[in-house]
């Protein structure tokens, strides 16, 4: 218990959201040490087995992960992949069958009930469903955990007002949940999760019940809270768009295993596992079906006929870190294949300051007659100097 209370990661954030320590023993310590570098959460060969109707079922298999302090870490996967089990292990709602889950160096599995209570007061939790008490006002819903903890009324009021300002709901202080939109209800849930000044905020599908516009506003709020308060966020979702919008690092979970992890720009720009590619398919610039139906494959050493258009698949993964020079790319193709070069399909995006995406480019061969393998190979070599990957799709 003492180790947990003295852990350097559980820091006071009074500068951002004023919260004077109460004299009651249920409140947090008045002077907590500053945070130190290192993992906020670590999973060490974690396995979790549940008893199912057909016998033991493994929800997680030898998961090893480090979640850096002060970042936004996303966990994504299909339904039933094991995402929520990971999150429940962090706050001690589940115990690992094997391995260890450490929060700021403390093995959660070794804590007794009193230790778990102390842990959970330093971990905020935002749920998919808002779980607000309909008979209580917004302010009362936010202040309820403080009331249960024995925080004096005046101090509760100051804390609640500061949190209402933080989440943009100061005007809704005395409103009841029935009068709020879905986004406003989730803002109340976020404010309530912050009442004990947590160093770690867990979000379990926090935007999946919201419309796209409201989702973006909630993600912007989470990013702002991360910047202003410096707390670590662990976010569970099945939407790659959510990962792209707010996360620094992502782990892909498939059938209880972490199959891929890394910076968001790298995982999006160069996915290495089939599960990751499947999740990204909704964001990919796939060739439209009407165009794909007309694409013919290259026939070995046979030259392409005069008048054909060579289709190239050009990829930018973000690995170079610079801006793509599309003018140089098209000029290189024009010199080596044909004078008429144009973009057919695709798009570029910027993730964590890195440009990435896919472009389908057509190079007309009409101006220079038929093109054989040597000419096509020269065109590919020239194009690859200006992109991370260039492949031939075929011709039309």
UniProtKB/Swiss-Prot annotation:
In the bilayer, the protein is annotated as: Peripheral membrane protein
Assigned EC number: 7.4.2.11
**What keywords tag this UniProt record?**
Amino-acid transport, ATP-binding, Cell inner membrane, Cell membrane, Membrane, Nucleotide-binding, Translocase, Transport
One Gene Ontology CC term in the entry: plasma membrane
Chemical reaction(s) catalysed: L-methionine(out) + ATP + H2O = L-methionine(in) + ADP + phosphate + H(+); D-methionine(out) + ATP + H2O = D-methionine(in) + ADP + phosphate + H(+)
Q: What is this protein called?
A: Methionine import ATP-binding protein MetN 2
Q: What InterPro entries does the record tag this protein with?
A: AAA+_ATPase, ABC_transporter-like_ATP-bd, ABC_transporter-like_CS, ACT-like_dom_sf, MetN_ABC, MetN_ABC_transporter-like, NIL_domain, P-loop_NTPase
Query: What's a Pfam family this protein contains?
Result: ABC_tran
MF terms (GO), sorted A to Z:
ABC-type D-methionine transporter activity; ATP binding; ATP hydrolysis activity
